[in-house]
């Protein structure tokens, strides 16, 4: 197999499909993860998925990826705007990563406009709904 990709979903994304569907859509996290795995396989890559509502658990999973994963795709959700610790973890493992958001955070509340990750990310994908996950997998496998 080619690239190994780790997909990390942050807080509240376990509620996909039911939480604010007018913003996040009706696709469940389970369905989204399966779709991403299948798409990665079709490109000759392997994708692992992980979700947590806890910042420390996300950091631990990033650390565990060191030396084992080629690319990280992360939707840090609310931690985008608050977590220097996740930023530091991503910098510390020296794995290229893609920052991903379902909605366009710049069209939402002002506090969502700042990201602690964007300036370190290889790419930022936002505003494409759950289709952004497919785009992220494509970019990760073909370019990183």
UniProtKB/Swiss-Prot annotation:
Substrate binds at residues 75, 81, 88, 102-103, 112. InterPro entries: DHquinase_II, DHquinase_II_CS, DHquinase_II_sf. SUPFAM superfamilies: Type II 3-dehydroquinate dehydratase. GO terms for biological process: 3,4-dihydroxybenzoate biosynthetic process; quinate catabolic process. Its EC number is 4.2.1.10. The active site is at residues 24, 101. It catalyses: 3-dehydroquinate = 3-dehydroshikimate + H2O. Pathway: Aromatic compound metabolism; 3,4-dihydroxybenzoate biosynthesis; 3,4-dihydroxybenzoate from 3-dehydroquinate: step 1/2. It comes from the Eukaryota. Signal peptide: none annotated. The keyword Chaperone does not apply. The record marks 19 as: Transition state stabilizer. Keywords: Lyase, Quinate metabolism. GO terms for molecular function: 3-dehydroquinate dehydratase activity. Pfam families: DHquinase_II (PF01220). Belongs to the type-II 3-dehydroquinase family. Homododecamer. Adopts a ring-like structure, composed of an arrangement of two hexameric rings stacked on top of one another. This is Catabolic 3-dehydroquinase 1. It comes from Fusarium vanettenii (strain ATCC MYA-4622 / CBS 123669 / FGSC 9596 / NRRL 45880 / 77-13-4) (Fusarium solani subsp. pisi). The lineage of its organism: Eukaryota, Fungi, Dikarya, Ascomycota, Pezizomycotina. The gene is qutE1.
